[in-house]
């Protein structure tokens, strides 16, 4: 990154994340609550009506991947976001932001994308679009 932009980012990121943080946290918690709850509901509903479908297991796999988003990287993400809001380390917020972006990229490909694929395959399977 251009040093001029780095200096600006180090100044602007902490207040931006302080303002965005609570709203963004609500969005993330809400979306993962919906993913986990709907995945579990679809798994349990199929069981209650006696359907033994492959889709049920895809729903559970999606739930597991969605839960991994929070369980594996949740504390690290919260710590990095706190560092960004606090201007750490030593006013070099872009260092913390870079770490958060790298962690987020890894998490997106390791668990978020597989969760999304599992939920899509589950839905298509239950609708008999695929076997």
What are these regions (language model features)?
Residues 48-67:
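Interfacial segments of alpha-helical transmembrane regions
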Residues 32-49, 75-78:
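Membrane-helix exit/interface motif
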Residues 25-28, 95-114:
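Individual transmembrane alpha-helices with interfacial aromatic-anchor signatures
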Residues 30-37, 41, 61-64, 68, ...:
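Lipid-exposed faces of alpha-helical membrane segments in multi-pass integral membrane proteins
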Residues 1-33, 86-97:
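Interfacial loop at the N-terminal end of multi-pass membrane proteins
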Residues 120-131:
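Juxtamembrane boundary at the C-terminal end of a transmembrane helix
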Residues 1, 67-88:
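Inner-leaflet juxtamembrane helices
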